Amino acid sequence: MKSQFRAERIHTVVIGGGQAGLSAGYHLAKQGINFLILDANNRIGNAWRNRWDSLRLFTPARYVELPGMRFPGDGEGFPTKDEIADYLESYAEHFKLPVQSGVRVERLSRDGDHFLIEAGGLQYEADNVIVAMANYQVPKIPAFAQDLDPSLLQLTPQSYRNPSQLQEGGVLVVGVGNSGADIAIDVARSHDTWIAGKESGHIPWDINSFLARHLAFPMIRFLGHHVLTLGTPIGRKKRPEMLHRATPLIRIKPKELVEAGIQRVGRVIGVQEGKPLLEDGRTPDVRNVIWCTGYEPGFSWIDLPVFDQQGEPAQVRGVSSVPGLYFLGLHFQYSMSSATLIGVGRDAEYVVKELKARSRSAERGRQIRKMPTPAAAESLSIPYARKA
């Protein structure tokens, strides 16, 4: 049995040390609140570093800005995943944010008047908790994937790095979203490649063009940050649809997939004789399958009654139905930009202000409850002021 260490009581614990957690840390420090950030990765930014090697942002660097510190370098370039990781690490160092790395939270529960955070042999007590991570953390893989021949290599966007991982032979990329298209282009340079699934649409312009950089991106940023929000009728109307709709292709276009020699095929509907079965009855002869089929919620470690019937956190702008528990970095938490490097800072400011105000209110309530009643005050010979 692991020995457990009970840490001192902390006002606020932030779970997650990515862009959401660091943004929360910036505003907590600004408000003078005692806090600690816990991150499962051994190094700040590793959630980005550990993604596939060729990954770049879809937006120019000038739109990458966490509160208080802009992204350095060429504002017109598209940052690599390692550049984003280094930026996050520099951000934490610059603002001296208290991040404890290599701590994977296994359970969050309530223990009397405080939260209990359990991570291996460690325990933390907190008056408030900010869960700072996206809704969807776990790759979604269909159940029939387990019926594929064991000799086939199966990967996801979380585990894929570069074509050197792959076995000789064909590659089937399942999912025609941005991750699937990017990875298909990457592997097609060295392997026969198929991409399966229904296209989710695409942005018609070249993101490297002058028009995109100086007209399209500013317009999209304005719409995503100021128009498609919970504060506008159109934002409230569109939110349910946007939460469940696939993002259109941004960098890679369908034409580029064809030009790269990638074969477009229909959906994968099952397994036949150990091979992926397409909806048209074909079974492509591949040795590798990369599942780019989205993600599922990764909040199973939260042992609190805070989820709705769909398994999503019950919250309004990050303030949950459980007093003292907050969320940050959720898709469309307030706006279409909420889960991005563009919009998470604004949400963090709101959440921290709400946390501070509610903490003050809760403390006043505790002080009032501790005050003696008139009868108790008289029995203890304590002067008790009465209204005239």
Residue ranges of predicted features:
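A short acidic, helix-capping loop that chelates divalent metal ions and anchors anionic groups
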Residues: 70-76
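Redox-cofactor-proximal catalytic regions of oxidoreductases
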Residues: 43-50, 55-68
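Flavin (primarily FAD) cofactor-binding/catalytic cores of flavoenzymes
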Residues: 2-17, 23-41, 45-47, 76-388
